[in-house]
Amino acid sequence: MLTHLDSQGRANMVDVTEKAVTEREATAEARVRMLPQTLQMIVDGEHPKGDVFAVARIAGIQAAKKTSDLIPLCHPLMLTSVKVELSAEGQDTVRIVARCKLAGQTGVEMEALTAASVAALTIYDMCKAVDKGMVIEQVRLLEKLGGKSGHYKVQA
């Protein structure tokens, strides 16, 4: 059953009033594939717009906090932790890992996915002048802890 639909099939924000407050955590990732020279410029700190990883990290954190403004049926959440980690993978990829936590009545998967996605979009925005062919890919949930549905971890 899709929880965001009422009995008539209309969009509906889920009522979490009666749900217990529990610790919840979610981890998501995204990757940005680019030209090797673009990644080298980022890693060497030679991008004319500044520290690409620092700006993308802040954008991801801010995005997690704004998820309910972007995705209509998401609840506004009081996040207790948002961490966004960026790293070079190989010669042409940036990997972004976003982790969100809270003690609340609903999960934080969308916040983690939004953080990873917006960090990736920020990298694209900052680097598009030198590499328009970048590809944002593999945006996915890696792990979820807490809540009624329990623990989920992506299969390797």
Swiss-Prot record:
Entry's Gene Ontology BP terms: Mo-molybdopterin cofactor biosynthetic process
Keyword Lyase: yes
Organism of this sequence: Pseudomonas putida (strain GB-1)
Keywords: Lyase, Molybdenum cofactor biosynthesis
Pathway field: Cofactor biosynthesis; molybdopterin biosynthesis
Protein name (Swiss-Prot/TrEMBL): Cyclic pyranopterin monophosphate synthase
UniProt keyword annotation of Lyase present: yes
Pfam family, one: MoaC
MF annotations from Gene Ontology: cyclic pyranopterin monophosphate synthase activity
Enzyme Commission no: 4.6.1.17
Record-annotated active site: 125
Gene3D superfamilies noted in UniProt: Molybdopterin cofactor biosynthesis C (MoaC) domain
Disulfide cross-links: none
Family of this protein: Belongs to the MoaC family.
